[in-house]
């Protein structure tokens, strides 16, 4: 409670470092409709067999359902319209990741506990960038999980997700280049809503906050006890 109440995907992942005890952590999104054991063993395997790997991302085909029709391609809209262009522009070393925003990934605790976590949907791209900067491209891997199907979100939700991801990339550029771009930009988003034939604006604050590395939290040291390697 003393660290404040926040919500978001990254917040949940950051807190999972505190409540878990293993040397390897694997995260899998909960909205997968074709869940299969390969989503687990496919991610754990490379980390067990390749000691040089610090972090592994899943990739796959991403079908999209439109009405009653499922198209073999077309999923991963935020990746293709926001994340991939940003990575090619500012972090080209990461441009070869097939699914940089994949919700199926894992890493070694002694690496993850050293990293800040974006509280919202910027967490995936933020972790990729930080591990690249701290450990180099050879520490990162990706594994083929064949195909992933999930509940597709409406376009307005994807727009808000992109807003968070863009903020995270700006923050990482600020940290890398000693800039202060993020503190000067607008952190509210005007969303275009419709009701019958009427259009109106709805303003929503979407500030992608960041948690410090878990290793900086005193209670984490206490909880990990003998399992914690200082």
Features from the language model and the residues they span:
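Short, ordered loop/turn segments at secondary-structure junctions
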Residues: 1, 30-33, 53, 58-61, ...
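Conserved catalytic loops of nucleotide-sugar-dependent glycosyltransferases that act on lipid-linked
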Residues: 20, 74-168
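Acidic donor-binding/catalytic loop of UDP-sugar-dependent glycosyltransferases
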Residues: 29-46
């Amino acid at each position: 409670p003393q660290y404040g109440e926040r919500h978001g995907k990254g917040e949940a992942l950051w807190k999972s470092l505190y409540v878990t005890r293993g040397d390897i952590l694997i995260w899998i999104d909960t909205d997968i409709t074709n869940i299969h054991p390969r989503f687990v063993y496919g991610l754990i395997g490379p980390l067990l067999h390749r000691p040089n790997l610090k972090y592994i991302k899943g990739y796959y085909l991403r079908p999209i359902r439109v009405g009653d029709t499922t198209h073999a391609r077309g999923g991963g809209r935020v990746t293709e319209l926001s994340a991939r262009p940003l990575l090619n522009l500012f972090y080209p070393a990461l441009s070869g990741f097939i699914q940089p925003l994949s919700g199926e990934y894992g890493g070694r605790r002694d690496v993850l506990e050293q990293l800040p976590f974006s509280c919202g949907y910027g967490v995936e791209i933020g972790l990729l960038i930080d591990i690249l900067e701290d450990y180099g491209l050879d520490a990162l891997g990706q594994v083929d999980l064949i195909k992933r199907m999930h509940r597709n979100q409406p376009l307005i939700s994807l727009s808000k997700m992109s807003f968070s991801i863009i903020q995270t990339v700006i923050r990482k550029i600020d940290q890398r280049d000693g800039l202060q771009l993020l503190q000067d930009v607008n952190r509210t988003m005007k969303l275009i809503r419709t009701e019958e034939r009427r259009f109106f604006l709805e303003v929503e604050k979407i500030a992608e906050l960041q948690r410090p590395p878990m290793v900086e939290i005193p209670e984490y040291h206490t909880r990990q006890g003998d399992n914690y390697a200082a």
